[in-house]
């Protein structure tokens, strides 16, 4: 198998009238998804050669999934550009990608025309009105090989220019073939999707659904601001599987709505993207004692997830959670404490950025006589006494103060374990040699200082404390650390 499309064909034949992807306004059955993708694919194949990038400038919806698959039907690859992205970032992405065409939501093509410049800008309504040409699409599929690109996702770059992470078909196939059996996914699964489609966590929701015949409901973003409403939504939609960033799980736990078996019907809770504090995880586990909880780890450059840990024992609130063991067909190597990853999961590199690619994807030190790439994650790790991999923080968040080597991630873990804290993070001010603690929850600095003194050695205690009503978030739902530092003048 060279790409994901045979999975779509299979479920469209097996259960054509069953709902596949649903949002607030639209729902596509498997047959509708299949046919819409083929119509869009035919339109694109008539306009463009294979293996060119296409930008999808669309809201998150079932039609966006159809457009993604339509791009693959045409033998091309896609980038998702969210409609809420700042115009400057959109332009930087377009400049790096040089897409052959922009696909937009119905009625939005004129709005995107300015950003597109001379690029063709076409609505999905226009593309999906094309008659299906099976012979043309079959010819395109014969040209696909599994090392062709499936998508490019843009992540933040340290220079302010987003980096396009290029992922091949074979990496997605390899990931999904592991994830579906390992995570016990089948056609009874009903995902409540949180991740934006331009965020790599969505790869699991979308493509594991294609493989397993599951169902995805795109939860309205506003509902994450109102956890009580979210609990009702999950139950009304009969959602039984969540794959959310930890911040999205922490908020309802902090507000006390995760209790007494709610949200009812949840059988699986997966999380990835940032550290999940055990204090909030324990709230979920107490409310849903029979659910399967899985902690996953992996940067965008390794196709979503490279290690995983099924939560199989009791943890104290202040204990760190393991990131566990490598996924199948994946090798994790610690090089001077840095987590480095190799295997089929690896990205092809950064699109149109050979220097950045060469710096991050390097020769594996243990591979002798043959080239074998590994990706330097920039994250620090170590193995515990059980042989489980532990995440210790970012390489660039390791500081030295008063002669002591300190992991800021360990301090953050202690902050989040404090009962009165709902969210927390810390920074280091090199100029003043001060550790800065930012927290939300009860505004009681004295109590927080006292609790941290019981958890941390003196040399690790924060010097400065900022109480925040709430933390700024990135579009992916994580703490926006860059914006936070700017707001605090750090």
What are these regions (language model features)?
Residues 1-5, 87, 102-142, 172, ...:
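AMP-dependent adenylate-forming
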Residues 58-61, 82, 185, 195-202, ...:
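Conserved AMP-binding
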Residues 1-152, 167, 174, 277-282, ...:
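AMP-binding/adenylate-forming domain of the ANL superfamily
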Residues 58-62, 76-95, 106-108, 214-237, ...:
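ATP-dependent adenylate-forming carboxylate-activation enzymes
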Residues 137-154, 161, 186-191, 197, ...:
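Conserved pre-ATP/AMP-binding loop-to-beta segment of ANL
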Residues 163-192, 200-240:
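Conserved AMP-binding/adenylation subdomain of ANL enzymes
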Residues 8-10, 62-80, 179-182, 202-214, ...:
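Hydrophobic alpha-helical segments in the ANL/AMP-binding
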Residues 211-214, 240-243, 253-318:
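Gly/Ser/Thr-rich phosphate-binding loop
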């Amino acid at each position: 198998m060279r790409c994901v499309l045979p999975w779509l064909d299979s479920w469209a034949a097996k259960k054509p009238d069953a709902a596949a992807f649903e949002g607030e306004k639209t729902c596509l059955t498997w047959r509708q998804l299949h046919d819409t993708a083929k119509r869009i694919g035919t339109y694109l194949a008539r306009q463009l050669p294979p293996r060119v990038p296409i930008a999808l400038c669309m809201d998150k919806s079932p039609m966006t999934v159809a457009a993604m698959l339509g791009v693959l039907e045409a033998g091309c690859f896609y980038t998702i550009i969210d409609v809420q992205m700042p115009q400057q970032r959109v332009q930087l992405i377009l400049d790096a990608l040089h897409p052959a065409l922009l696909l937009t939501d119905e009625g939005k093509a004129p709005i995107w025309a300015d950003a597109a410049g001379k690029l063709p800008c076409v609505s999905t309504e226009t593309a999906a009105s094309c008659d299906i040409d099976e012979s043309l699409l079959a010819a395109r599929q014969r040209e696909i090989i599994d090392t062709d690109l499936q998508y490019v996702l843009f992540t933040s770059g340290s220079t302010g220019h987003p980096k396009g992470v290029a992922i091949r078909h074979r990496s997605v196939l390899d990931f999904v073939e592991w994830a579906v059996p390992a995570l016990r996914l089948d056609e009874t699964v009903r995902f409540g999707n949180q991740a934006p489609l331009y965020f790599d966590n969505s790869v699991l929701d979308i493509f594991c659904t294609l493989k397993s015949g599951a169902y995805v409901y795109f939860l309205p973003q506003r509902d994450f601001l109102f956890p009580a409403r979210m609990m009702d939504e999950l139950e009304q939609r009969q959602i039984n599987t969540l794959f959310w960033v930890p911040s999205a799980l922490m908020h309802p736990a902090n507000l006390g709505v995760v209790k007494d078996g709610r949200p009812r019907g949840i059988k699986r809770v997966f999380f990835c993207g940032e550290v999940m504090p055990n204090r909030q995880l324990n709230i979920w586990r107490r409310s849903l004692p029979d659910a399967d909880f899985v902690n996953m780890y992996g940067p965008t450059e390794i196709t979503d997830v490279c290690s995983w840990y099924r939560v199989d024992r009791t943890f104290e609130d202040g204990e760190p959670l393991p990131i566990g063991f490598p996924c199948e067909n994946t090798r994790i190597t610690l090089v001077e404490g840095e987590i480095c990853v190799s295997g089929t999961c690896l990205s092809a590199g950064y699109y149109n950025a050979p220097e950045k690619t060469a710096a991050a994807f390097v020769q594996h030190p243990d591979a002798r006589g043959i080239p074998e790439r590994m990706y330097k994650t920039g994250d620090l790790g170590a193995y515990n006494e059980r042989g489980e991999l532990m995440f210790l923080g970012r390489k660039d968040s390791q500081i030295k103060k008063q002669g002591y080597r300190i992991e800021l991630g360990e301090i953050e873990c202690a902050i989040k374990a404090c009962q009165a804290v709902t969210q927390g993070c810390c920074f280091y001010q090199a100029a003043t040699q001060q550790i800065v603690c930012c927290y939300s929850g009860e505004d009681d600095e004295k109590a927080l200082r006292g609790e941290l003194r019981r958890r941390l050695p003196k040399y690790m205690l924060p010097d400065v404390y900022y109480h925040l009503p709430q933390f700024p978030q990135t579009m992916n739902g994580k703490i926006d650390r860059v914006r936070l530092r700017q707001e605090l003048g750090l």
